[in-house]
From Swiss-Prot:
PROSITE patterns: SAM_MT_RNA_M5U, TRMA_1, TRMA_2. CDD domains: AdoMet_MTases (cd02440). It catalyses: uridine(54) in tRNA + S-adenosyl-L-methionine = 5-methyluridine(54) in tRNA + S-adenosyl-L-homocysteine + H(+); uridine(341) in tmRNA + S-adenosyl-L-methionine = 5-methyluridine(341) in tmRNA + S-adenosyl-L-homocysteine + H(+). The active site is at 326 (nucleophile), 360 (proton acceptor). This is tRNA/tmRNA (uracil-C(5))-methyltransferase. Dual-specificity methyltransferase that catalyzes the formation of 5-methyluridine at position 54 (m5U54) in all tRNAs, and that of position 341 (m5U341) in tmRNA (transfer-mRNA). NCBIfam families: trmA_only. Belongs to the class I-like SAM-binding methyltransferase superfamily. RNA M5U methyltransferase family. TrmA subfamily. One of its GO terms (cellular component) is cytosol. GO terms for biological process: tRNA methylation. InterPro entries: MeTrfase_TrmA_AS, MeTrfase_TrmA_CS, SAM-dependent_MTases_sf, TrmA_MeTrfase, U5_MeTrfase_fam. It comes from Actinobacillus pleuropneumoniae serotype 3 (strain JL03). PANTHER family: TRNA/TMRNA (URACIL-C(5))-METHYLTRANSFERASE, TRNA_TMRNA (URACIL-C(5))-METHYLTRANSFERASE. The gene is trmA. The lineage of its organism: Bacteria, Pseudomonadati, Pseudomonadota, Gammaproteobacteria, Pasteurellales.
């Protein structure tokens, strides 16, 4: 698989041109553009596993992907989009499990999650129930990979079954504005795929909010990626997240980073809107006095569908809005309403996904 590295600058310029045109009706300042590394930038990858027989009758297996247009499978021995650690593990893993019936039989997928800190989780997915014999073989595999120098976690997954030999997460350390931030990242839950671009996003968000007063509300906080980085810019931070594993990771990350002004609530943005408007009461909010927060800044990083109408109405009530978007078209839709009351102070493009049409962007809005 070859990347069109020589075309990267032109591809990024085209994205910037398109985003600038999309935002033009809202009179933004000049777009800030943050470029990615041109290869080995992705921290996670997943591959199907193909089983074959070579010319001398030996069983072979290799990673495959599918062409998005033709749907034809193709073999992947190296994956230049993924970071060097994943590429190294791809070849080491297959070499170690080759010929091992317990580890390879009905293995259909392998997922990799890596970090800049040098840790990697390998999740092996099976169409069979995993037993103690599998665990023993997987433990031996883990030991062999560790002997090669890998800081590795091995996980096995099958229908209604998940086995973590040691733990089901890796720990990332991100240098943000001169400070190392620790993030627990759980296998099979959302993490930012381009870690170095994530650092640029965090630093940009911090620079937008540097001289803020009052408190911050964040919706969809995940493992605390943004709220932890932003906490020192505010008196207090209140954040919501619906995923149980993400909330647990966020609580751990808050503790590890010594953050004492950040509270996470497990509820959806829609539920929180109802609570703020007094429409419903929630047991999950017992012990949390929402009136004690003076949240005049809100941070949103919604799904591709953008903000729903009720949340959009709620967001509009805040003095300052920091909006990170993974879909510029729904961002533009939301801005039609938000710019009735707010102006765009800053706008940015973060090339989280080079060589694709996907665009990550951010806008910093201030009440008019």
């Amino acid at each position: 698989m070859n990347l069109p590295i020589e075309q990267y600058a032109d591809l990024l310029a085209e994205k910037a041109k398109n985003l600038t045109a999309l935002l033009a009706p809202f009179n933004p300042p000049e777009l800030e553009v943050f470029e990615s590394e041109t290869s080995h930038f992705r921290m996670r990858a997943e591959f199907r596993v193909w089983h074959d027989t070579n010319e001398v009758g030996e069983n072979e297996l290799y990673h495959i992907m599918f062409d998005q247009e033709t749907k034809q499978r193709y073999r992947v021995d190296q994956f230049p989009i993924a970071n060097h650690l994943i590429n190294k593990m791809m070849s080491s893993l297959l070499a170690e499990i080759k010929g091992n019936e317990l580890l390879t039989r009905k293995l259909f997928q392998v997922d990799y999650l890596s970090t800049l800190s040098g840790e990697i989780a390998v999740s092996m997915l099976y169409h069979k129930k995993l037993n103690e014999e599998w665990q023993a073989e997987a433990a031996a595999l883990k030991a062999r990979l560790e002997h090669q120098g890998f800081k590795v976690q091995i996980l096995g997954r099958a229908t209604k079954q998940k086995i973590a030999l040691d733990r089901d997460y890796v720990e990332e350390v991100l240098p943000v504005d001169g400070r190392n931030l620790i993030y627990r990242q759980v296998e099979n839950s959302f993490t930012q795929p381009n870690a170095k671009m994530n650092i640029k996003m965090l630093e940009w968000a911090r620079s937008c909010t540097r001289h803020s007063s009052g408190d911050l509300l964040e919706l969809y906080c995940g493992n605390g990626n943004f709220s932890i980085a932003l906490a020192e810019n505010f008196r207090k931070v209140l954040a919501t997240e619906i995923s149980k594993s993400s909330v647990q990771s966020a609580q751990y990350n808050i503790e590890q980073n010594g953050i004492d002004n950040l509270q996470i609530i497990r509820m959806s943005a829609e539920e929180f809107t109802q609570a703020m408007n007094g429409v419903r009461e929630f047991n999950r909010l017992k012990g949390i006095d929402l009136k004690a927060y003076d949240c005049n800044t809100i941070f949103v990083d919604p799904p591709r569908a953008g903000l729903d109408q009720d949340t959009l109405n709620m967001v509009q009530a805040y003095e300052r809005i920091l909006y990170i978007s993974c879909n510029p078209h729904t961002l533009a839709d939301n801005l039609q309403q938000l710019t009735q009351t707010h102006r765009i102070e800053r706008a940015a493009l973060f090339d989280q996904f080079p060589y694709t049409h996907h665009v990550e962007s951010g806008v910093w809005l201030i009440r008019k």
